Amino acid sequence: MFHWEKVGRGFLGAIGEYPVYAEQGNNVLRVRRGATPRPARETRALPRIVAEYFALDHPLAAICASFPDDPIMTAAQNFCGGLRIIRQPKWECLATFICSSMKQVAHIRQISRALRERFGVARSLLRVRPAVDNYVVHVFPSARRLANSSQNELRECGLGYRAKNLLATARLVSSGEADLEAWSALSDLDLQAKLCELPGVGAKVANCVMLFAYERLRAFPIDVWIERVLRQQYFPRARKLNSQRLRKFCESHFGEHGGYAQQYLFHYARTALRKSGGSKVSSTPLRSARNNKRNDGRMGGNKSISRSKRKNKSKSRSENGTTSAAQVVSAPGLR
């Protein structure tokens, strides 16, 4: 989700191995796809692929109706109308969030682009429209491709200490020791435990992957931004609030669609509240969230699946969001 770019009147990116140009108008999402090397393997029509990726089948009205009836959630819901939780490819999602530790969104985008351009396969979008003629999209590199790279090569993409973790996890996934697809059958608790066994994955990254790749909509990632909002809006007078208490509150308060609530709060805090200065909090250090991020990013790359008994210490937005699955249109001239 970090690689999509505004081009012309639409957005350019990749859905798995497919280069895609998407443009929305009048509640209709028009999508064009570039060439792929294995067209025979894909039997689904493009509208179905796009609708699945952007989760256009999620009952957004019902999900929003399940949000807590409190001022901050009401404001966030009104501000973020149409925001959806996308369904990302599992390996791409996991690798990207391993790279995200202690990084701002702009830096994550830079890393994602560097990995794609250095290790990913280039796909061209031909005859889409003049604004994007001959535009090349690099798809995210496979686990096998990154497993055959080196730490130095990954560091040259801006990963720093994260290179060790990404390389180790890529090798586990590539070898089949970490079977990301098979993990879909696990319960939420077991899935989180499996993810946290991987190098570079702590509670926050695990929850991000559960939410965006495994569609576990109860997952509620807590980073510095979210903790800041939670403390200010729900615990303004609490001097001592550890991460365990905060997690339990989120589970009970936000419920079965906590992941959606988290995204609405996150986007609202980073845009409307930040611009108005309303998200300012006291100078009390946000130790629990920061420690979580350190755990996510600095876990040793020598961890393996066999160490499962060791305890872990611990937007994509469819424009307007009103497009339904039936309104996705495959534009003429698709390849």
Which stretches of residues belong to each language-model region?
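HhH-family (HhH-GPD) DNA N-glycosylase catalytic core used in base-excision repair
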Residues: M1-R298, N302-R335
